[in-house]
């Protein structure tokens, strides 16, 4: 498996992600919430045998970095762990996590913050002195 890192408006991003982001099954897996990107995003894309098996977009915001929509084919834990391991923020990393993926994010060092019905806010603190 290869993890690609692409800027939010790179043409290659749209070629890789477009077919998935417009696929009704993928949108259902994301609770029918559309995927979005701007120049403030970095995308981490898992590719295996020329197929995209998952992606994690990370948005840079004033308080840190945010993962708020991601996709992994068949909820493959190994792919999600690899994608999360590729993300190396310089600041706090927040994630809005689907409840079914809470244990995976927790095992990758994220801590639970507020819990909602379908999602959990989690944080990975990159400043070890806090």
Annotate the PLM regions.
Residues 45-59, 66:
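Conserved beta-strand in the GNAT
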Residues 22-47:
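Active-site rim helix/loop that mediates acceptor-substrate recognition in acyltransferases
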Residues 99-118:
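Conserved active-site alpha-helix within GNAT-family acetyltransferase domains
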Residues 73-90:
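Conserved acetyl-CoA-binding loop-helix of GNAT-fold acetyltransferases
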Residues 1-30, 129:
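Short amphipathic alpha-helix that is part of the acyltransferase structural core
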Residues 59-68, 115-118:
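A conserved beta-turn-beta hairpin within the catalytic core of GNAT-like acetyltransferases
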Residues 88-100:
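Conserved GNAT acetyl-CoA-binding A-motif
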Residues 47-49, 123-126:
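Active-site beta-strand termini and strand-to-loop segments that position acidic
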């Amino acid at each position: 498996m290869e993890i690609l890192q692409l800027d939010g408006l790179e043409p290659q991003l749209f070629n890789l992600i477009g077919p998935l982001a417009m696929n009704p099954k993928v949108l259902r897996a994301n609770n029918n919430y559309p995927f979005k990107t701007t120049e403030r995003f970095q995308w981490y894309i898992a590719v295996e045998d020329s197929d995209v098996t998952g992606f994690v977009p990370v948005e840079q915001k004033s308080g840190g970095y945010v993962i708020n929509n991601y996709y992994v084919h068949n909820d493959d834990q190994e792919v999600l762990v690899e994608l999360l391991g590729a993300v190396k923020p310089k600041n706090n990393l927040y994630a809005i996590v689907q409840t079914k993926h809470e244990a995976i994010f927790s095992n990758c060092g994220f801590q639970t913050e507020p819990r909602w019905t379908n999602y959990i806010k989690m944080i990975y603190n990159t400043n070890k002195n806090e």
